[in-house]
Amino acid sequence: MSYSPLLGADRRAGEPSSGLASSTSIRDTLSGALNSTKAYLQPFTPASPYLGSNGVNGHNEPSRLLSDVAPQLMTTRMMAAVTNSNTALGLTPDGQRRARLLLTPGFSITSPARSLVRIGGSLIQSGIGRGPMNGITSNELFVLEESDRILATAARDLDLEANADAQLGARSAIEASKSKAAEPSVSLLRGFQATIPSSTEGRQRRRRVRALASGFEDGPEGPTKLGLKAMGDKARGLMVEGVDAEPVSAFQAREQRHARRNQASRILSRAKEGSRSSAIQLEELERQLREIEREQGDVGVRRSLIDSEMAAVDDKIKVLENIKAGLHKKLLGLREEELELNDEHEGVGELLAVQKHLRAMPGGPAAAANAAASGGATTSQGSSRRRKGPLFMPSEHDELPSGVAFMTLADHSAPITSLDFTEPYGTLVSASLDETVRVWDLASGEEVGRLRGHVGTVKCLQVEDEVCITGGSDHSIRIWDLTKVENFEARLTMTASGELRARRRSPDLNRSPPPVADESMDSIKIRDGDTTAGDGDEEEVRDEFDPCVKRLEGHSKSVTSLYFDDNCLVTGASDKTLRQWDLNTGQCVLTMDILWAISNPTSSQAISQSEFGFPESPSRKASSSSILGATRPDLSSRDSFSVLNNLSGAFSYPTPPYADGSWEMYQDFVGGVQFWGYALASGSGDGGVRMWDMRTGQAHRTLLGHTAPVTCLQFDEHHIISGSLDKSIRIWDLRMGSISDTVRYEHPVTALQFDSRKILAATGENGVKLFNRTTLQHGSLTLNGHTSPVERLRYMDRYAVSGGKDCVVKIWAL
């Protein structure tokens, strides 16, 4: 291919010109481009006879340039037709020259390469310009491919220095392209030239030339051969053509060896002499040098093409990875939907079983109809903490934005210590350090009344349907009927106002001391004017209206956790014991001593920490002199009695700082209890999670993993999930007996609840933490939320309640 200064400068040219809106502007632009081309080519006029004012066929310079760009277009027949049409239209010679391109159908300045290819193809198909020697050559294809930059270069008014710089830059770019590992782009024609099989023929030709020059192939009978291939084939056991299979004598074999050796020596000596004498001609060496440089360029082009293909493959891989990630996300969404449907199926199945059971009983159809009319609330069996399936909620709940607190209950004057509710938009009971237990109507957000009777703080409570059980720092457990709270509050208000009127009428009543609360169940007296007083006839009134229906005593210290289901209640207290109660009789039927379980581990309890995913280490086995130590004692060691002596005293543990920097002494030795059937799980201040058999009262397994007191736990058919002051939530697989996952936070965990899809936790921050068990993603409920760390929470389906140190209770839509 011939190299012209125009094409050399064009490799340095700038961006292609933008499209023009009208034919007038197109003609002006092309005219200016042709004039610029004249000025650009004038310095090179003496150097080439093809760049004069008159060129081939008598055309002037612009016509010659256009003929080079579109040889199939600028033929004699086409030019004559254009000239005749211009004459008929009365165009000037300059206009005629511009019209030669602009009047051609399908030509566009914005995409000249495409236009020229289309016009050339149409001309070939029509037979115009076709001859025995005519056709589209590689040079013409290259020009067509580079026409965008040719026109852009011609449209610029460049001076001689700029032209020289452009030419030098183009040559530098060509030289740099040979050394670069990859080019940003390779033309189609150049890539074809570099990859055709004939591009490697020069290498074989040069080998033959060197062989001839060195004497290997200059024999009178053709190329001289050493028989290397025959020896190689024979060594591999192949049949060698032309070799006599008859055995030869030792003398003949020796003579053949001598002959071959002499022949090889002569050939090698001639080869060495030939390489030293450089018998190859100068023209041949220059040709070989050009071939090598071209092949080096071809290697660079092929490398660029391979790099481009690899980059394209990488892009496709990224796209496929994005598609895979999207499909994986959809798969996780389907998994969540499947789990939700499983829970719904189980819940509906339970309701159906209850309905069938009611219908099978005497008077069953009426009872089933009443249960169905009540919305299914009375048909639920078991604790609501294990209840699955959809809940009955108003349709307005779907209109609430998820993750936003839409209700605030703010009558408490101290941090919330415990809370629970019956169902969404039902009844909520909350306890606080202000030593009050308040009952709320979640449909209106108003306080219904209070549960009066405990002296001190209520530390734990549970609500099921219309029954509430509370445990407090006064060592007692009380059972409440929530249906009586509102009427009892009204009676207290009426009694208090009536006694006040009586005092105003009687001076003796005004001199009486202020009433105080009596701890006995035989009478209820006025405390700060809140409750009624009386004995005798008042006893009957108390039995009828008092919401406290029973009081259970047995623990010697604060009751810190409880769980009840049906007629069975289990409580845990700071006296390091667990007690099982019969709610029908109010009697304690079983006492389980945690200290005894620590000091007397059974054979089934003696489970190594490595079995649960924790490696055995001296630091974990070393006994500690205090529960405040950083290491946990070996519960199966005989040396742990010193630790038990410390545990037998008053228990306290400093909590890690919360998000607001506050901390306190944690004194609840039993952080959480839950049972199902005869299986009981408890979390205690020594960091252990124990599994108890309620038939024998023995702890048959201890799950070790937490390094601080366990504050909360919950379990289902397959997992126990526990939270601790060590800032972690641990998920225990009951089937494998090991930790399946650990979720860590920056602050202590004080409360949690989970289902098959998510875990909600209070982790010492202002927001409620949400962990998706399917996607393993973390979230937080903060919008319109608490202003101090959250400490208690409870949720059902898409309805959650939380209480914090800011003394308020927040209601959330999940």
Curated annotation (Swiss-Prot):
Record region (Disordered): 1-24, 365-394, 499-542, 608-631
Gene3D superfamilies for this protein: 6.10.280.220, YVTN repeat-like/Quinoprotein amine dehydrogenase
Main location: mitochondrion
Compartment(s) of residence: Mitochondrion outer membrane
Keywords assigned: Coiled coil, Membrane, Mitochondrion, Mitochondrion outer membrane, Repeat, WD repeat
Membrane topology term: Peripheral membrane protein
Bias type Low complexity, positions: 365-383
Assigned GO CC terms: mitochondrial outer membrane; nucleus
Superkingdom: Eukaryota
Keyword Ubl conjugation attributed: no
InterPro entries tied to this protein: G-protein_beta_WD-40_rep, WD40/YVTN_repeat-like_dom_sf, WD40_repeat_CS, WD40_repeat_dom_sf, WD40_rpt
Sections of the chain in a coiled coil: 270-303
WD repeats by residue range: 411-450, 453-490, 554-591, 659-702, 705-742, 744-781, 785-814
UniProt keyword annotation of Coiled coil present: yes
PANTHER family found in the cross-reference section: CCR4-ASSOCIATED FACTOR 4, WD40 REPEAT PROTEIN 12, 37
Family: Belongs to the WD repeat MDV1/CAF4 family.
Biological role: Involved in mitochondrial fission. Acts as an adapter protein required to form mitochondrial fission complexes. Formation of these complexes is required to promote constriction and fission of the mitochondrial compartment at a late step in mitochondrial division.
Identification of the protein by name: Mitochondrial division protein 1
Gene designation: MDV1
